[in-house]
Amino acid sequence: MEYKDTLLMPKTDFPMRGNLPNKEPEWQAKWEEEKLYEKIQEKNAGRKAYILHDGPPYANGELHMGHALNKTIKDIIVRYKSMAGFSSPYVPGWDTHGLPIETAIAKKGVKRKEMSIAEFRKLCAEYAMTQVDGQRTGFKRLGINGDWENPYITLLPEYEAEQIKVFGEMAKKGYIYKGKKPVYWSPSSESALAEAEIEYQDKKSASIFVAFKVTDGKGVLDEGTNIVIWTTTPWTIPANMGITVNPDLDYVVIESAGEKYVVAEALLPSLREKLGFEDATVVKTVRGSELDRVVTKHPFYDRDSLVMNGEHATAEAGTGAVHTAPGHGEDDFLIGKKYDLEVLAPLDDRGVFTEEAPGFEGVFYDTANKMVTEKLEEVGALLKMEFITHSYPHDWRTKKPVIFRATAQWFASIDAFRDDLLAAVKGVNWTPAWGETRLFNMVRDRGDWVISRQRAWGVPLPIFYAENGEAIITDETINHISELFREHGSNVWFERDVKDLLPAGFTHPGSPNGEFTKETDIMDVWFDSGSSHQAVLNARPELSRPADLYMEGSDQYRGWFNSSLTTAVAITGEAPYRNVLSHGFALDGEGRKMSKSLGNTLLPGKVIKQLGADIVRLWVASVDYQADVRVSDEILKQVSEVYRKIRNTMRFLLGNINDFNPTTNAVSYENLREVDKYMLIKLNDLVKNVKDNYEAFEFSTIYHQINNFCTVELSQFYMDFAKDVVYIEAADSHDRRAMQTVFYEAVVTLTKLLAPILPHTTEEVWNSLIGEGVESIHLQDLPEVKVLADSEEITAKWDAFMQIRDNVQKALEFARNEKLIGKSMLAKVTLYVDGEAKTLFDSLEGDFAQLFIVSDFELVEGLENAPESAFKSNQVAVQITVAEGETCERCRVVKKDVGVNPKHPTLCGRCADIVVKHYEA
């Protein structure tokens, strides 16, 4: 007889290697064919809703690791909620208007000026939809479960129609107005930008100190005295209309080389060296308030520059006197308005000077910096010029510097409902908690929102103009345009004449001749995505407003979180979300931003081809995503190793329940051995902890908890000593069926707990466990937390045992290193115990040799009896010796009773009994 044939070795069709790149598409095809998303919605119909509203990614370019991070976090949340008793539909979306798409079309050689706007926009729409299709394929390959056949897309007519309604409602409440004031202007994009479209980068700029000569000192300053200003934008000097000083600061008049100069007293020490005023004497001190309405002369134009009082002039830097150009700065504009100064902005859309700046016509503003500085030097007004590097606003799309430029734009007034916005921020639950402060401060400090853009590809501003120039935004026109867009799309605005866009028979007192014109500007793309609460949440029957969760990158506090809040509070009075969760950015392994120039980009598509989507998803679960996260080949290798451990654990569990039927073979909890109960209690604790952490969106804790359970509780303990039972004992023996009961519970529980994170692998486990044709794991609910008898008492006892077991393992390791034993199965453990440890072992049930995975065990009372060579800890001493007896051919345990049955001379008594009873014919 071959004794190896009597061993009950693991059998499973669940392979050791995942082969994820090839297997995952098969599962995805099956899910699509079986309409799994729809089945999940049907299963959860009638349950409490949990709505995660997808912030739309921009439909341009290949998916990057930031996309993978974002969509996977969302998918984990939605899958968890769908298995936790909620109805949680997921409607993905795309943001499809804006400059990057115009630029992409231009790069293809399309000449925008050589075709109608409507034709150009059609090309933009076609391009955007191809990008949507490409990204949709990528997201589906990542295992993201959602309504991919019916996403929301901002260029679709039904979306645009609802966006028009949002605009109309805001206009109706008086929140929309047209005004001329400085806005961020991008010469590279030839358009106004909102704050959300600005990013700061270091820029080298000329820093100049300029003298303005007093022509009317109002009895405070002598004529010819120089007021000194400092600026890092020399090109704005042609637009200078005044100088601002702080009314509450002290200013000194100093005399140097026969000239008088005025600077803030607090800044004089730093300016003495910088401007060569080392020998200057202070002639007099005046309060800033005394300088109000002093008149100076522009350095090279024949006009006055008025001295004004303003709080924004400080003694933190410069001279305390601020060069003021109302056409090129927000503070400048506001104080200029107060003092009734002209708003001069002598630049065109491309940033080129017009004839309003004599001497600089046709010059690009940045080039003009040098010319202006030279002109100031020529007229003797330049006191100092140097270069500094400072943080400067740039166009987030073109990466080129932006300027402040006063132009006529359409605005949404934030002041009109700022208090409501701030109250709404306070009413939302923010994770991380600092998100509340961040958005609150942004809303508190932000100016009005410039919503018009001078571009072609976007939703038109639905505004008509009467003959007298009056803007027309009425319920009648808004509803008509909304329905026109719903039926024909927004291109109709550019395809039809004004008369065909207005409601039939429309009249207006400002147009006695019945003539009208239409606005040519489009809306800021943030108004597009910011309207999704109306166009998606409110419009779709399966969704609702407010959403339970908005979850995006931390850059969206200034973006989508902000624009969505603004439009929602404006039209509904409340935030569009109950909870907001934000994540950091995906960086390379060294914590650097990924970029083509650094050659450190890692694309999810490539990783999925090499390792599989479940590895990318496990990486997402492993990181503390609320901060910036790192990803590299090395990090993914570490994640793959954890995946391998989880997979091997599943394979072992599946392999050892191949002859187990949970209906007929399971052992009830009360009939289990204590060590088996202990494992079920630990498993139950895991269920509670994992569910709590899913609820708190703490996925990295789940990753560590499950990895720890698989590695420590199962692999290093329970599964390890179980081999001596499940391989060796008779198939139907109580102890074997008890352990299989635990194995079955463990594999079912782990599979369900991991399903939101590893959808493909858990489906594979589930099919192997339950059989082909089974209902998907994703249609199951998460395991419930059970109340298990005596759990506290059993846990306390066995946790204490596990600590002692750790000491035994260390002693065995030491003995192996010292060559006292080979494998631990050749060892005998003698344990010397006192006090609590003695009481513990007296109360424990179990085969301790088996639990320690050695051949023999002896318990001796009294630590003092331990030999010097024993491995000692505070409670026990461990002596390792070679076990006496012979190795049983079947179970490989060293036993003194090997050969007790002469028919089976190489077997121990236990194995001989099993063979005789179950395997001899």
UniProtKB/Swiss-Prot annotation:
Annotated Zn(2+) binding sites: C888, C891, C908, C911
Top-level taxon: Bacteria
Gene3D superfamilies from the UniProt entry: 1.10.730.20, HUPs (3.40.50.620), Ile-tRNA synthetase CP2 domain-like (1.10.10.830)
EC number: 6.1.1.5
A GO BP annotation: isoleucyl-tRNA aminoacylation
Annotated PROSITE patterns: AA_TRNA_LIGASE_I
Residue interval(s) of motif 'KMSKS' region: 593-597
Keywords: Aminoacyl-tRNA synthetase, ATP-binding, Cytoplasm, Ligase, Metal-binding, Nucleotide-binding, Protein biosynthesis, Zinc
Residues that hold ATP according to the record: K596
Motif range ('HIGH' region): 57-67
GO cellular component: cytosol
Pfam family, one: zf-FPG_IleRS
Classification via SUPFAM superfamilies: Anticodon-binding domain of a subclass of class I aminoacyl-tRNA synthetases (SSF47323), Nucleotidylyl transferase (SSF52374), ValRS/IleRS/LeuRS editing domain (SSF50677)
Cofactor field: Zn(2+)
Coiled-coil intervals: none
Protein residues bound to L-isoleucyl-5'-AMP: E552
Catalysed reaction, written as an equation: tRNA(Ile) + L-isoleucine + ATP = L-isoleucyl-tRNA(Ile) + AMP + diphosphate
Manner of cofactor binding, per the entry note: Binds 1 zinc ion per subunit.
Subcellular location: Cytoplasm
Quaternary structure, from the entry: Monomer.
Family: Belongs to the class-I aminoacyl-tRNA synthetase family. IleS type 1 subfamily.
Written domain comment of the UniProt record: IleRS has two distinct active sites: one for aminoacylation and one for editing. The misactivated valine is translocated from the active site to the editing site, which sterically excludes the correctly activated isoleucine. The single editing site contains two valyl binding pockets, one specific for each substrate (Val-AMP or Val-tRNA(Ile)).
Task of the protein: Catalyzes the attachment of isoleucine to tRNA(Ile). As IleRS can inadvertently accommodate and process structurally similar amino acids such as valine, to avoid such errors it has two additional distinct tRNA(Ile)-dependent editing activities. One activity is designated as 'pretransfer' editing and involves the hydrolysis of activated Val-AMP. The other activity is designated 'posttransfer' editing and involves deacylation of mischarged Val-tRNA(Ile).
Name recorded for this polypeptide: Isoleucine--tRNA ligase
Originating gene: ileS
